[in-house]
Amino acid sequence: WDKNSTLVDPMCGSGTICIEAGMMLCNIPAGYYRNSFGFFNMEDFDLELWKKVRNEAKDKIDLSKGITIYGSDLAMKSIRISQKNLDNVPDLKRIVRFRGKDALELDAPNGICTVIVNPPYGERIYKDEVAILYQRLGEHLKEEFKGNTLGILSSNIEALNLLDLKLEKEYDLMNG
């Protein structure tokens, strides 16, 4: 994602991808909203240095971006969790939006976008259901999001092949 286009996560779950993308977009450091860290208790912890570093980071935050990040999920429970997680990063409420919607019915936003999706791997649903889901997801993405950039996170190689999408790049990642 180049941070110059709308980002869409059609199976957002708890909203992690959307929220972390929003933080990257606005240059908000990880952990910025935390009030305490374990290193505060270290013997040589320098509170004044910490305040200086934190203020420097604050000065680099840019909330003026005109980009919108959309997360959707079929499960309303996931949307509630996503919204609760977004409450922990209040500066992003103008940028990140969550809604309940089936990924297979999701419309592409106007203009160019990047879709990042982490579909179910088959750990919580049956193998046959995963196969059908990946086939239908591939069809929908090809039709509705044609011409846009797509990133898929999955450890289920067999299911990924069912998407029937042209692969430009592949990366091995450790998730978790």
Q: Residue locations for each model-derived region?
A:
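Conserved S-adenosyl-L-methionine
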Residues: W1-D107, E123-R124, A131-L133
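C-terminal catalytic and target-recognition region of SAM-dependent MTase-like enzymes
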Residues: K101-G176
